[in-house]
From Swiss-Prot:
Bias-annotated ranges (Low complexity): 291-300
Subunit structure: Homo- and heterodimers. Interacts with GEBP, GPL2 and GPL3. Interacts with GEBP.
GO molecular function terms listed in the Swiss-Prot or TrEMBL record: transcription cis-regulatory region binding
Domain of life, per lineage: Eukaryota
Tissue: Expressed in the apical meristem and young leaf primordia. Detected in the vascular tissues of cotyledons and leaves, in hydathodes and at the base of flowers and siliques, but not in roots.
One cellular-component annotation, GO: nucleus
Species of the source: Arabidopsis thaliana
Lineage summary: Eukaryota, Viridiplantae, Streptophyta, Embryophyta, Tracheophyta
Name this polypeptide is given: GLABROUS1 enhancer-binding protein-like 1
Family: Belongs to the GeBP family.
Pfam families: GeBP-like_DBD (PF04504)
Extent of Polar residues compositional bias: 257-267
Any GO BP annotation: regulation of DNA-templated transcription
Amino acid sequence: MVTPKQIDFSSCGGGDNSDDTLSHRESPRNPSSKRAAASFAAEAGEETMKKKKKKKKKNLGPPLIVRIWNEEDELSILKGLVDYRAKTGFNPKIDWDAFYSFLGSSIVAKFSKEQVLSKIRKLKRRFHVHWEKISEGNDPKFTRSSDSEAFGFSSMIWGQGEFGNDDGMDKEMVKEHDVNGNGAAENGTARIAQENESGEEMLKEHEETLNENGAEEIRDNDETARKAQQLESESEEEMLKEHEEPFNENGAENIRDNNGTTQIAQQSESESEEMLKEHEEVANTELVNENGAAKTTENGTTGGKERHDDDDDDELCAVQDAFEAVMSQGLSGYQKKLQLEKLMNLGTGKRRELSDEWKALCVEERRLNIKKLRFSAKLAEAANDS
């Protein structure tokens, strides 16, 4: 039977060597702890960098916007524009250099011409927004006490919501931008914030002129055409009434001279008929000869037919305009087409009746809008004075 031997691990060299070996074994190496310490230091450094970046971002922040216009300045601009337009006879083209000089020293000393024009553009856009809300039956929700007064003055300048006249503001802004390079203006005082406009916005301005009766003439293509036709028909009727004076039994026509005296000129029946025909030609009325046929003009065209066609076109346009303004809302495209075709095929009498009634309603609506604008301006002034 084999007996196991015990192996002696002790060194043969003596006790000193044995102690060195044991001490060496009792202090093993630990490289993982060094790596952990290095990674911890790296993470701490990254967190420190992130905190520094966040502090820098907080310190930068958005730039402060300093308000350089106040409510009184805006009202002064609008009042000045109303007074200037009244002084220049409501000229559609505004001389902005002259207007800037027209403003008081309180505005000229604080703001440059470009800043004034930029503020007018913003006031105009603000008025457009309020006007659209009012037209839709919504409350404009004026947030400042001066907003109602500013709206009253703005309505006197750009009222009625029909914009399209060129007042030369775009060209003036482009010219100022070319002169100053980046659009900045200097008038001797430091400007904290420059109000710059971005994009290519097409400014449209509604200029209104008052005629002798106080009625407003709206310079819009369709409205101008309708009003011109209406004025033309009224002038034709007045001309006929002036010239178709009654004749006495002897065929004498009563003619009043400039001094108010009446002179009687004897004329034959044929001469009086010729005069009536001449006046009818001036009034563009239908010419009818003795046989009832339409009288032809020199170039061979029939004057009565042309006049009839013009009347038909005018009536059709009026009926179509009334349909689009009153009935077309809420209808689909197919429904609009069917309804419009039926209206276009109406009889002459019915179509003329609808056309005349719609024109009368348009005139009444314009007069009512004028009264509303004047009342709003008076109301704003009364509120400001009190």
